[in-house]
């Protein structure tokens, strides 16, 4: 399945992903349901950041799902057909020996080792990996919203809220934010980072004023 969309900055983004609809008959719902930050939690964070005059930043993790491994013992295949077989073989000629024909069409089967986009369990696998990283860094997951995490640093609360791979972070000290983002980037290289007070987050243009608005 191929998806193409125009982003807000006029860039065109394309993605080839799996067709997860074929999995619904055999993947249990509890293995595919991933938490996402609620609107109420997001609004609460923004109000707290503004009221406490916290420094802020937003960042996203490019190709987030692909950082997560498929569970050990789970076997899944990706069926590549037609012109996409040629593209894959152009990238890695070693795959040419594995190409076969089915009803006159080129077909290449590849074992899936990462949580690729489109698979219905990928969001949960990414969530579990990201939470593990935050816990290792000393964060505590909010008991009321599983996509909000807090950590006390230099006597002040540092908060991260995330919606899949889009994150917003706030702390009184901007250098603390830089340090926390650097630690996350050490795990997931290539973060796209924005520094406050002006942020573009989840389709919203945010501006944190010094007068707590």
Mark where each language-model region is.
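Long, low-complexity, charge-biased intrinsically disordered regions
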Residues: 1-213
């Amino acid at each position: 399945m191929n998806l193409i969309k125009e982003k807000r900055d006029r860039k065109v983004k394309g993605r080839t992903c799996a067709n997860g609809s074929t999995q619904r008959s055999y993947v249990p719902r509890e293995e595919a349901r991933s938490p996402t930050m609620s609107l109420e939690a997001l609004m609460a964070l923004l109000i707290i950041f503004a009221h406490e005059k916290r420094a802020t930043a937003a960042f996203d993790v490019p190709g987030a799902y692909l950082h997560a491994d498929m569970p050990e013992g789970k076997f899944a295949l990706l069926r590549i057909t037609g012109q996409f077989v040629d593209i894959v073989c152009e990238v890695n000629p070693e795959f040419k020996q594995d190409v076969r024909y089915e009803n006159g069409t080129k077909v290449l089967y590849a074992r899936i080792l990462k949580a690729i986009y489109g698979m219905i369990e990928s969001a949960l696998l990414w969530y579990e990996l990201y939470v593990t990283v935050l816990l290792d860094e000393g964060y505590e997951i909010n008991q009321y919203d599983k996509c909000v995490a807090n950590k006390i640093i230099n006597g002040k609360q540092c908060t991260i809220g995330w919606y899949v791979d889009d994150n917003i972070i706030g702390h009184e000290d901007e250098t603390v934010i830089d340090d926390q983002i650097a630690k996350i980037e050490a795990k997931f290289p290539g973060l796209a980072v924005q520094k406050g007070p002006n942020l573009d987050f989840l389709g919203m243009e945010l501006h944190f004023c010094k007068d707590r608005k």
